[in-house]
Curated annotation (Swiss-Prot):
Tissue spec. comment: Weakly expressed in roots, leaves, stems and flowers. Expressed in the primary and lateral roots, including root primordia and root tips, but not in the hypocotyl.
Signal peptide: 1-25
Domain Protein kinase: 734-1005
Single Gene Ontology BP annotation: regulation of defense response
PROSITE patterns documented for this protein: LRR (PS51450), PROTEIN_KINASE_ATP (PS00107), PROTEIN_KINASE_DOM (PS50011), PROTEIN_KINASE_ST (PS00108)
Protein's UniProt keywords contain Ligase: no
Effect on the protein of changing residue 598 to Y: Decreased responsiveness to PSK for interaction with BAK1 and decreased root length
Glycosylation sites: 55, 64, 73, 106, 160, 170, 187, 242, 301, 311, 373, 378, 391, 472, 493, 510, 534, 606, 622
Function: Phytosulfokine receptor with both a serine/threonine-protein kinase activity and a guanylate cyclase activity. Regulates, in response to phytosulfokine binding, a signaling cascade involved in plant cell differentiation, organogenesis, somatic embryogenesis, cellular proliferation and plant growth. Involved in plant immunity, with antagonistic effects on bacterial and fungal resistances. Not involved in PSY perception. CNGC17 and AHAs form a functional cation-translocating unit that is activated by PSKR1/BAK1 and possibly other BAK1/RLK complexes.
Protein's recorded name: Phytosulfokine receptor 1
Organism taxonomic ancestry: Eukaryota, Viridiplantae, Streptophyta, Embryophyta, Tracheophyta
Keyword annotations: ATP-binding, Cell membrane, Glycoprotein, Kinase, Leucine-rich repeat, Lyase, Membrane, Nucleotide-binding, Phosphoprotein, Receptor, Repeat, Serine/threonine-protein kinase, Signal, Transferase, Transmembrane, Transmembrane helix
Gene Ontology terms, MF aspect: ATP binding; guanylate cyclase activity; peptide receptor activity; protein kinase activity; protein serine kinase activity; protein serine/threonine kinase activity
Source species of the chain: Arabidopsis thaliana
Other comments on record: PSKR1 and PSYR1 mediate a signaling pathway by two distinct ligands, which redundantly contribute to cellular proliferation and plant growth.
Amino acid sequence: MRVHRFCVIVIFLTELLCFFYSSESQTTSRCHPHDLEALRDFIAHLEPKPDGWINSSSSTDCCNWTGITCNSNNTGRVIRLELGNKKLSGKLSESLGKLDEIRVLNLSRNFIKDSIPLSIFNLKNLQTLDLSSNDLSGGIPTSINLPALQSFDLSSNKFNGSLPSHICHNSTQIRVVKLAVNYFAGNFTSGFGKCVLLEHLCLGMNDLTGNIPEDLFHLKRLNLLGIQENRLSGSLSREIRNLSSLVRLDVSWNLFSGEIPDVFDELPQLKFFLGQTNGFIGGIPKSLANSPSLNLLNLRNNSLSGRLMLNCTAMIALNSLDLGTNRFNGRLPENLPDCKRLKNVNLARNTFHGQVPESFKNFESLSYFSLSNSSLANISSALGILQHCKNLTTLVLTLNFHGEALPDDSSLHFEKLKVLVVANCRLTGSMPRWLSSSNELQLLDLSWNRLTGAIPSWIGDFKALFYLDLSNNSFTGEIPKSLTKLESLTSRNISVNEPSPDFPFFMKRNESARALQYNQIFGFPPTIELGHNNLSGPIWEEFGNLKKLHVFDLKWNALSGSIPSSLSGMTSLEALDLSNNRLSGSIPVSLQQLSFLSKFSVAYNNLSGVIPSGGQFQTFPNSSFESNHLCGEHRFPCSEGTESALIKRSRRSRGGDIGMAIGIAFGSVFLLTLLSLIVLRARRRSGEVDPEIEESESMNRKELGEIGSKLVVLFQSNDKELSYDDLLDSTNSFDQANIIGCGGFGMVYKATLPDGKKVAIKKLSGDCGQIEREFEAEVETLSRAQHPNLVLLRGFCFYKNDRLLIYSYMENGSLDYWLHERNDGPALLKWKTRLRIAQGAAKGLLYLHEGCDPHILHRDIKSSNILLDENFNSHLADFGLARLMSPYETHVSTDLVGTLGYIPPEYGQASVATYKGDVYSFGVVLLELLTDKRPVDMCKPKGCRDLISWVVKMKHESRASEVFDPLIYSKENDKEMFRVLEIACLCLSENPKQRPTTQQLVSWLDDV
């Protein structure tokens, strides 16, 4: 009985399932043959085929294909085609125009090239067209017939020609127009005013000229207008008041001039007004200064003037105020604290005077405050008032309070202060005790003042302090031993408050860098700067415990005793300057273990003995050791004549160099013979062989010396003959004023040759041995390494103690300069320019890896080794320092080089440099381009000091979009930026085998 019932149930359920299956199959839409044919032709032009697409001639069920939606009335017409972010490459087919029932066409975030087929602009039912973030080019046709269109997004492509404002003639229902990040040029034409329903108009980062057309001001529903980074000019029209729904107005980085119109009381919903870097004059309009809706006001870098008057009682929503670099004068507005939500204030570089108002005691919301270069007075009053700002974390007061006394008032207390900069004020007094109560202090800069007395021991009690600059004062006594115990420099537990990303943070320039090329800004590396004081006593052995310290500068003091060998424990150290002291003994050999040390000086001390020759010491110039009793192989030979070979200059002068002359005498035969061989090879390559030199491969020292005094070997046949004297004249005898940076193994000078050409001359340090072999490697290899994305070696010269390399001059300096040092650099580097820089540099690297014979490993890929010409084309520099490889080798086992933050993890495990190591370093550069952040930067929140770790963390939290530089990131170009981020992360794989080849890297970047 039970079996019978079970069978009946099974039969019933089977019949029921068959019924539903039959019913469903009868109602399922099958793709209309007309649309099927169009889709097959469309996909035939693209690769790879999307998942689930069936490219078989027998299949007719395209309504089930990925990204396809058909209507529900059994006609099988395609109404949605959505294949965004599918890595599709190829071109679009005219057959798309046959999908005459389509409502949504979304092919964004792919790699589609060429122009848009004309047929697409005649789809009468199309409501959404999104082709953003592709590689599409050409102009937009004058005839557009899209009457149902509501959203039109062609941003982040390569479209050119006139702005397609005529789209509104037949598309009156359109609500969103996004054309940003393209190459549209010419006058900002009228036409958009016919789109009466328009809400978003994004035209930023093109090349538009003229002014905002009048018909645009008829758009009552417009809430976002982005026209930033064009070349628009003239005054901002008063008719902007008609845009009553406006929420965000961005006119920054244009050429607007005149006064800002006083019409903001008619823009009741405006939250964000960005007008920085224009030519606005006058004051803040009264209506803008009374806006209750405004959240952010950025008018930095204009010519605004007069008294600053804001009605903060009315500005109840204001959060960020940036009016830096203008001409405001008078006193600081007393009512700023009435802006109850105002957190970030930048008023630096104006002409304010007087004192910080007493009312600032009530500025409870204030977090970031910069008043640098504002001619303020009464620092005692200012600090006494600002201490009441309970949320204040960053205070920058540089270039104020000239000659006043730094108060030592025990009642002062800054509870949450993390960054304090009161530099270059010529303050008198001593280190105030009240600073010790700021327990969260992380960065303290009191440099370039006139402070005296001892540096107190409590300075080492700060748990988070990682940057201390007390240089250029008059401190006396010993260095407090407590500094050797700074917790932030012995552990990774560091957290720094990061200012608002739209605000310029205080930056300390590298004063030794005098021009664009190779310039670097020290982005707050962990630092102890105590130079140019009157400190005495020893350098404590315990300083070796500061494993996280990057810069240790004690120059120009009266320190005595020996250099502790324990300093080798400062394993992150990049710069060590102990020059101009009274140190004795020898240079510890253990310092050779400092792998990242790139700047070192012990000049003008009383040191003796042998200069270490291993590690980074082979790269330091003789000037690092001068005015001591030191000797060393390849420098000042240690021999029977050691006494005469020592440098015996007066402590503070640089007279004749007897030891150098003897050293040159011992090495001249080798140097001049090497010169003859290199000259002979170079002339043979150029087809200009001197018969006398060819006959005699050995010349006496006098003859070669005479040739060397005149000869500059040039590799370009059209270059005019040069002599060493010409190079001296072109650099004013290598005057420091012509230094444009420090490249590999020496200084780089800007030179203008007799024919008017600009070049960069690298003057190599060192005399022979390893240094000469590196020089010969550069000369022999770079003369054959010719590629548009490499810095061209134009020639070289041997003369006496000088070895000179002559390079092409790069007008725009280094990528590092534009990203990290020049204040407006990141904003001027648009995304398309950054992408082109990455693509070019990758091509240069591919040539080094595969195009050269022998192949070359760069081994020091970084943003400061990517130079930019006048058109911002990228050129790899300093690759001559790489070890050479035969075409059949896959790695070299030599002493490793590199720069902290760019070095692959595997380099710490074995002395093996590989192509994949260069790819890793290139991935770090890609992150710099995307984020505008340094690889290692202490001024980041906890866990964000290391750029790679921070990016990985943000990706895992699905917050990848937050890593992008806000100056270039927008929905218009996010597809390209996400793709480059993906490429960067692949380059940064911990397993070298999982990283792309250089060829793949180039191909992927070209397809972005």
